[in-house]
A protein has these predicted regions:
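P-loop NTPase motor domains
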Residues: 1-121, 136, 197, 205-229, ...
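Conserved ATP-driven motor cores of ASCE-family P-loop NTPases powering translocation/secretion/packaging/pilus
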Residues: 113-216
Length: 246
């Protein structure tokens, strides 16, 4: 290792930095968790598997573990697709990335997102608002949105999100306006004026005021859809969940 030939001060600095980065792995519980490979990550692309990574939303101390998991999964699945299955996994893998803002992601996540679909790997990014995405990817947030073929808006109270949906996703609608005029008197007359004008399909304020029963769905190449949200309590398997009394 070349660093051993550095000056004592430089070597000491490297050792301190390394010790700080690996400090949490001194915990016996964490060391036991990461000592051996029990997940067989490539198998997720070869058979149906549900893998849950649960993290607390009020404590980010160990969120780096999920970051490591994501990084290794992307690497393993891409390698498997490219070198064993000719570029596409036999079983599609779908990442449901809740708490997206609280998890450290690979630095090249934007590039990963752009090339994953051809390998039968998909991701659903779940965020409170667009501002959170801008905070995470200041220069690449538009590219990330552009690489998502579907955008589902469930509601919110953040201004830049309302504006983006109104101006960039919904577009404008056409309004037909008829104006009638009538004047009385000896030479009274009657006139009609027909005019076509445009306005936002929904203004930012109307997006903000969206009824909580509804959601807005945008699919690439299709018209926007406003539809009722699905009531999860009506799902036929709800009795198997904690919400259903299991």
């Amino acid at each position: 290792y070349s660093f051993v030939f550095l000056r004592p001060l430089g070597l000491r600095l490297i050792q301190i930095t390394l010790a700080a980065r690996l400090e949490k792995f001194n915990l016996s519980s964490l060391a036991a968790l990461t000592a051996t490979d029990e997940l067989n990550l490539p198998s997720l692309g070869e058979k149906k598997v549900a893998l849950f990574a649960l993290i607390p939303d009020n404590d980010t101390s160990f969120n780096f573990l999920v970051s490591i998991l994501y990084t290794q999964l992307f690497q393993q699945l891409f390698y498997l697709a490219d070198y064993k299955y000719g570029g596409s996994l036999p079983v599609p893998v779908h990442f449901l990335m809740d708490e997206f803002r609280n998890v450290s992601l690979p630095e090249d996540f934007s590039k990963i997102l752009a090339v994953m679909r051809s390998r039968n790997v998909y991701v659903s990014i779940i965020l409170q608002n667009v501002a959170a995405l801008k905070a995470l990817f200041e220069k690449e947030w538009e590219s990330i949105l552009g690489n998502c073929d579907e955008f589902l808006y469930l509601g919110g109270n953040e201004t830049s999100t309302h504006k983006l949906i109104s101006e960039s996703y919904l577009g404008k609608s056409t309004i037909d306006t008829n104006t009638y005029g009538k004047s009385s008197g000896r030479n009274g007359n009657y006139s009609t004026n027909y005019q076509i004008s445009g306005r936002e399909l929904l203004t930012p304020d109307e997006v903000r005021m969206l009824d909580n029963r509804y959601a807005l769905l945008f699919i690439r190449g299709e018209r926007p859809v406003m539809d009722e949200k699905y009531d999860i309590l009506k799902h036929p398997n709800i009795h198997r969940t904690e919400d259903g009394g299991a």
